[in-house]
Amino acid sequence: MEMGRRIHLELRNRTPSDVKELVLDNSRSNEGKLEGLTDEFEELEFLSTINVGLTSIANLPKLNKLKKLELSDNRVSGGLEVLAEKCPNLTHLNLSGNKIKDLSTIEPLKKLENLKSLDLFNCEVTNLNDYRENVFKLLPQLTYLDGYDRDDKEAPDSDAEGYVEGLDDEEEDEDEEEYDEDAQVVEDEEDEDEEEEGEEEDVSGEEEEDEEGYNDGEVDDEEDEEELGEEERGQKRKREPEDEGEDDD
């Protein structure tokens, strides 16, 4: 799916200014560049573009409130100076799996004064001698590099993931509310169907009763006819002896 189309779907009838988290993982970028993102996403705090084929972030829009940026598994090899200009409040940056080969490539990150965590897993720069020591010297504002601090203490999960989980919880609550509303609509429709079926059964019952009544009426008529026939025959038998007596006279 193209990145522009993915952004449209992620909006879910919201305006860009309402969005705080945007996940575009595995979508397709146009010619290796970001597309569909504009300055209108002024409240955006978390952006994830994992494995979208990026080679450049030059057209990244102004995102003053962006705190966490996921760029892993792309083909970015430089141009990181744009981050300090467009995302001055960035605290977490993941460049794992990109084509970062030397320290000079990440030097522009010095201008990100609030940068607290940087990930460079599976980048060639990690193979350099004294890699960790040199990165911490180059970027003194960093607290965590590849998930560990200067003393090789692992970053707490709450620091790395807590912010995103908080956003996920909010979205889950919204989804649950939407689900509950949809479920209620379905229940109401089922109740209506049951009522209609009940009415149909009542009508069918009345029709059957009418038919039975009609049939009973036919039987009664037949019985009346039989009784009437017997009376006529009886009267005829009475008349016959009388007729015979008259003949004798």
UniProtKB/Swiss-Prot annotation:
Acidic residues biased stretches: 157-230
Residue segments, region Necessary for tumor-suppressive function: 150-174
Q: What InterPro entries does UniProt report for this protein, alphabetically?
A: AN32 (IPR045081), Leu-rich_rpt (IPR001611), LRR_dom_sf (IPR032675), U2A'_phosphoprotein32A_C (IPR003603)
Annotated positions of the Phosphothreonine modification: T15
- The residue ranges crossing the membrane are none
What are the residue boundaries of the LRRCT domain, all occurrences included?
123-161
One GO MF annotation is: histone binding
Q: Where is the composition biased (Basic and acidic residues)?
A: 147-156
Q: One GO biological process from the UniProt record? A: regulation of apoptotic process
Q: Where is this region: Disordered?
A: 147-249
Which compartments does it reside in?
A: Nucleus; Cytoplasm; Endoplasmic reticulum
| Family classification | Belongs to the ANP32 family.
Q: What is this protein called?
A: Acidic leucine-rich nuclear phosphoprotein 32 family member A
The species this protein was found in: Homo sapiens
Gene symbol of the encoding locus: ANP32A
